Amino acid sequence: MKPDQGGSGARIQVVSSWDEIEAVFARDPNVWLPDNLFLLQEFLPHDPDQGIVRMEFLGGELLYAMRVKTHGRFNLCPSPVCNPDDGEGACELPDAQPVSTPPVEFYPYLEVPREAVEIGKRIVRAARLDVGGIEYLETDDGRRVFYDIIANSNLRPSVASAWGIDPFERVVDFLVQQLVGAAR
């Protein structure tokens, strides 16, 4: 269950039955405020060593991609502020339960399949996103499932440098081009 409260894995809870969902609401009904909106998302078994894939797009083109090993965590924000290499991120909720798993790991993914990139391009085009991320995973039964469309980017410079780019410079250049084009 994911509440309508932004990212950083905020208040996500794993449930496996309707009884568990009802128990979450009974235990803490205020967690879903102010709008009582939540998303019930299927948990998809996948190889934890492969993790998930996040592709960052800029102007409809792939900027770079990364593999993310979650270690069972839900805060997958790639910003070094949220998920530094030492695991002491600034985006954890103060009331969150302590997590005893290793920190989330981010690796450059230079061999992202062409088909995945093309689907990602179609998604960002359909969503009319100039800058954004798309996440997918490959299930244990071989399906590639795109499950998150991120309408902004939290760039991870260490991953982008493996692609030979500075992501911040690319975004600034893109925005300058947009401003110049709009001024004409």
Where are these regions (language model features)?
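Residues that act as N-cap/strand-start positions at coil-to-secondary-structure junctions
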Residues: 49, 130-131
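Short strand-connecting beta-turns/loops that link adjacent beta-strands
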Residues: 6, 60, 139-142
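A conserved helix-loop-beta module that forms one wall/lid of the active-site cleft
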Residues: 1-11
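Hydrophobic residue at the +6 position relative to the catalytic HRD Asp in the kinase catalytic loop
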Residues: 134-136
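C-terminal active-site "lid" helix and adjoining low-complexity regulatory extension at the edge
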Residues: 110-115, 124-129, 138-184
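Phosphate-binding site of ATP-dependent enzymes
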Residues: 10-124
